[in-house]
Amino acid sequence: CELSNITIVLEKEECGACVSVNATWCSGYCYTKDANLMYPQKSEKQGVCTYTEVIYETVKIPGCAENVNPFYTYPVAVDCHCGRCDSETTDCTVRALGPTYCSLSQD
């Protein structure tokens, strides 16, 4: 479980454009075990590779009207660990659209 470079696409519908940015995020493997065979009544907590700390960076999205805030702030991981996925701040599913999805025109 470690920091890795990733390209993500930021989208602001009011501006009609998407922008690709480089960032760091956490990826990799965490130790897991399945005790169901030996102890079916005991459930194990499985760790996932997630961030310990993030900072926020801001980019200006082009093509925004004058009455629209053109700035978009996004998280960038600065440290990773194996732990519980916090569904309050993270999409813990595997059904996300992916970091390069854009429903608008891309710059």
Curated annotation (Swiss-Prot):
Pfam families per record: Cys_knot
GO aspect biological process, one term: G protein-coupled receptor signaling pathway
Q: Which SMART domains match?
A: GHB
> Which InterPro entries does the annotation name?
Cystine-knot_cytokine, Glyco_hormone_CN, Gonadotropin_bsu, Gonadotropin_bsu_CS
Compartments annotated for it: namely: Secreted
Main function: Together with the alpha chain CGA constitutes follitropin, the follicle-stimulating hormone, and provides its biological specificity to the hormone heterodimer. Binds FSHR, a G protein-coupled receptor, on target cells to activate downstream signaling pathways. Follitropin is involved in follicle development and spermatogenesis in reproductive organs.
In its UniProt entry, what is this protein called? Answer: Follitropin subunit beta
Write down the species.
Aquarana catesbeiana
Question: The organism's lineage?
Answer: Eukaryota, Metazoa, Chordata, Craniata, Vertebrata
